[in-house]
């Protein structure tokens, strides 16, 4: 279930070696593909039968993952299917700062109760998501004020530093309950405050809406892009700091208006590291050759 599910294809997932938000439970694209057909300039490549595992040689289909059209066009893919889970629950946790969130994610990655999906968003993305929430009315308005008072005044969280984790748990009722109980316990250990299922679900809905937010921003001459990389746990902050600094330098060098936007989240956790997903935006109002300048900035950012 990749973030781009509405705007992408199965062949595209294979060609880009894609991952999805629920890879913890169902695997990445390479884990769920059984057969692939590919059309190349030399003819059609067909995999005769599924190969679950072989101890001799390698799986030829592995060459096609991440090939990005260089070998040919993927025309057919047979995927494994899973039963729809009996139970699904969303949840969310608010942490005092980014480091607390990282500590929670790292310890969670070593447990036996990793949920189908778990994401850590930085303060900027957290506030962005809050800004896009529908304005509460009636009882919900008072409930929202009480929640805000509790988090900021009672718990002492700084609105400009707090970050959030969103969670999706799937499986049998007993599996989901086990995950929820232990995730709650671990969150409290790292000074987290449970934010509830509504905030958790809304966090994932923002993921699907981001392409439309990009199109909306384009009307106001703001260009945006996303990029991701996988790094060891020990290098997370180094990569974030280097990327943020590089964007600021490039923004100044190109004499662009306003301030650059950059935010990040950790959508995937692994035993030895994480995937960091960056979102960036730049105003190009009044800029000559904006596409060319933005393309150069993007390539420079990817090198970091």
Name each region found by the language model.
Residues 106-300:
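C-terminal substrate-recognition/cap domain of FAD-linked oxidoreductases
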Residues 35, 300-301:
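Generic recognition of well-ordered alpha-helical segments
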């Amino acid at each position: 279930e990749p973030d781009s599910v509405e705007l992408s294809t199965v062949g595209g997932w294979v060609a880009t070696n894609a991952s999805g938000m629920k890879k913890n439970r169902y695997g990445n694209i390479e884990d769920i593909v059984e057969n692939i057909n590919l059309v190349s300039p030399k003819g059609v490549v067909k995999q005769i039968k599924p190969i679950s595992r072989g101890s001799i040689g390698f799986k030829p289909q592995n060459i096609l993952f991440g090939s990005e059209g260089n070998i040919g066009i993927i025309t057919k893919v047979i995927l494994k299917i899973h039963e729809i889970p009996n139970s699904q629950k969303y949840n969310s946790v608010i942490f005092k700062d980014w480091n607390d969130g990282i500590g929670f994610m790292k310890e969670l990655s070593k447990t036996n109760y990793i949920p189908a999906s778990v994401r850590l968003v930085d303060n900027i993305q957290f506030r962005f998501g809050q800004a896009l929430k529908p304005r509460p009315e009636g009882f919900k308005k008072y409930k929202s004020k009480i929640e805000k008072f509790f988090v900021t005044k009672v718990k002492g969280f700084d609105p400009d530093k707090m970050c959030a984790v969103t969670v999706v748990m799937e499986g049998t009722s007993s599996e989901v309950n086990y995950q929820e109980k232990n995730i709650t316990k671990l969150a409290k250990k790292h000074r987290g405050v449970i934010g509830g299922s509504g905030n958790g679900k809304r966090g994932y809905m923002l993921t699907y809406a981001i392409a439309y937010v990009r199109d909306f921003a384009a009307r106001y001459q703001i260009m945006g892009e996303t990029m991701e990389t996988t790094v060891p746990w020990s290098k997370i902050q180094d990569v974030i700091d280097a990327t943020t600094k590089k964007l600021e330098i490039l923004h100044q060098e190109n004499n662009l208006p306003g301030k650059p936007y950059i935010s990040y989240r950790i959508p995937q956790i692994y035993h030895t590291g994480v995937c960091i997903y960056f979102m960036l935006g730049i105003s190009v109002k009044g800029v000559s050759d904006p596409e060319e300048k933005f393309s150069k900035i993007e390539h420079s950012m990817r090198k970091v």
